[in-house]
């Protein structure tokens, strides 16, 4: 069972841990003997205390228990489909798997869906397996049709490279890439120099068009229009697996459950071309109790980049999950021991709010560090209690051009700019229904305006409903 602590607890500091990056020591934690894996990303040398541990040090405690890695993955509900369970189980339990997960750089930040994959990579790395983070510098030029109803926007090479650079920085916060313990590879290395005729002969000959079109993602798109560009995606993803197998001995691919058909294509290509066995496993999709993908808000995706989704907003997203989803999120996304989560399953009523606070803090700490998690928690509690502490609240800064000639801005525009609503009509309804307040005063007038003077300096606090806040100001 795996637990993560950021900033080593004092009880562990007193237990005589050696702060060697990557070294595992035995310590006592909560009365149990545990193994401590210290991953400081090279920030600490042998025998030294870690420097600047806030946000940089990752301390993972592996507690002694009778569960194998595979049993824990199943108990947490992480596994959806597998090709050969016995073989995969044997390899991951004994630290013999070299596996990869692909990340297409479609944006300049990872999001919550990626975070779930990173957590799985970390769990398996701690068990001695070697993860490969495959960055889609090549496949990103095409775009994965899985889960799409339309064609993805074409990205330039420069945009894709920028996104890859952003991904790298974020991944290094979670995965230990030192000394070959994990690899970060860009598939542009082999895809961008492919000879098309050679690809058709060497790879295309092993794929049946009829079989490709039976894949769910392609069946859905056939009804709306599937470009030839996207049609090639399965072949290219399969070729990735084939190349990783040859170059790095990668014998497993993990990914979202919507990737199953593409992953099977890779195992089949390896079998046909090399006569070797390769394996695939899909991760449970992060869905809420209504079957909808989690990780989205009215203003868009929940990002791991604090400049795109603030630590406060990130915390609030998890603090506000539905009662029916909190335990599932605990199991899938946190490193809390299963026995602690199982105790929380018995909680009811107001106790569920405490469980949500634990979930929100754990995930904010994992992504943004202990200090930011504490700030978000303090800010959320102050706002919930009606306090005036707005230091850690998400903010929106207005520019001079946001005001009219008289130096005013209407409330509906403020709601849209602060992402408390997505459209003006939604903002109008929220005001008319009494769901909007300015500095604690409910506003029912849809024509309400605020002056630039009122917004200069500290600004005002906008509130929509009971849980959504934003401080709006101008300089």
PLM regions: where:
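Compositionally biased, intrinsically disordered low-complexity segments enriched in Pro/Arg/Gln/His
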Residues: 18-20
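Conserved nucleotide- and phosphate/pyrophosphate-binding catalytic cores
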Residues: 270-475
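Low-complexity, intrinsically disordered Ser/Thr/Pro- and acidic-rich segments
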Residues: 40-48, 53-56
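NTP-dependent nucleotidyl-transfer catalytic core
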Residues: 57, 62-259, 264-267, 274-279, ...
């Amino acid at each position: 069972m795996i637990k993560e602590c950021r900033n080593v607890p004092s009880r562990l500091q007193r237990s005589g841990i050696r702060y060697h990056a990557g070294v595992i020591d035995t310590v006592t934690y909560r009365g149990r003997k545990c193994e401590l894996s210290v991953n400081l990303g090279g920030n600490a040398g042998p025998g030294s205390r870690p420097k600047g541990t806030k946000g940089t040090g990752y301390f993972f405690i592996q507690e002694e228990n009778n569960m194998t890695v595979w049993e824990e993955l199943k108990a947490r509900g992480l596994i959806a489909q597998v090709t050969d369970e016995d073989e995969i189980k044997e390899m991951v339990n004994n630290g013999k798997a070299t596996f990869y997960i692909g990340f297409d750089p479609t944006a300049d930040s990872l999001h919550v869906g990626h975070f779930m994959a990173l957590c799985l990579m970390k769990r398996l790395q701690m068990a001695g397996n070697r993860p490969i983070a495959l960055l889609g510098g090549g496949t990103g030029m095409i775009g994965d049709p899985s889960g799409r109803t339309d064609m993805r926007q074409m990205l330039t090479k420069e945009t894709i490279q920028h996104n890859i650079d952003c991904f790298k920085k974020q991944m290094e916060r979670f995965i230990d890439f030192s000394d070959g313990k994990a690899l970060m590879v860009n598939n542009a290395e082999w895809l961008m120099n492919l000879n098309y005729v050679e690809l058709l002969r060497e790879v295309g000959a092993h794929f049946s068009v009829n079989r490709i079109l039976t894949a769910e993602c392609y069946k859905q798109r056939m009804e709306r229009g599937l470009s030839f560009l996207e049609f090639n995606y399965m072949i290219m993803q399969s070729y990735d697996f084939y190349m990783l197998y040859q170059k790095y001995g990668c014998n497993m691919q993990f990914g979202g459950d919507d990737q199953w058909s593409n992953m099977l294509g890779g195992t089949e290509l390896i079998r046909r071309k090399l006569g070797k066995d390769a394996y695939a496993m899909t991760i449970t999709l992060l869905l809420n109790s209504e079957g909808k993908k989690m990780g989205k808000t009215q203003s868009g995706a929940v990002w791991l980049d604090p400049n795109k989704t603030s630590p406060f907003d990130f915390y609030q997203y998890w603090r506000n999950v539905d009662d029916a989803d909190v335990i599932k999120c605990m199991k899938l996304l946190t490193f809390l021991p299963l026995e602690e989560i199982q105790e929380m399953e018995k909680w009811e009523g107001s106790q569920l709010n405490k469980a949500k606070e634990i979930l929100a803090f754990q995930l904010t700490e994992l992504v943004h560090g202990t200090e930011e998690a504490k700030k978000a928690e303090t800010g959320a509690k102050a706002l919930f209690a009606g306090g005036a502490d707005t230091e850690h609240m998400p903010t929106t800064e207005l520019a001079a051009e946001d005001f009219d000639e008289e130096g005013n801005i209407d409330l509906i525009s403020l709601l849209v700019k602060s992402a408390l609503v997505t459209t003006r009509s939604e903002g109008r309804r929220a005001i008319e229904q009494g769901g909007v307040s300015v500095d604690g005063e409910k506003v029912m007038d849809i024509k309400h305006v605020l002056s630039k003077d009122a917004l200069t300096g500290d600004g005002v606090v906008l509130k929509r409903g009971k849980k959504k806040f934003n401080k709006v100001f101008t300089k």
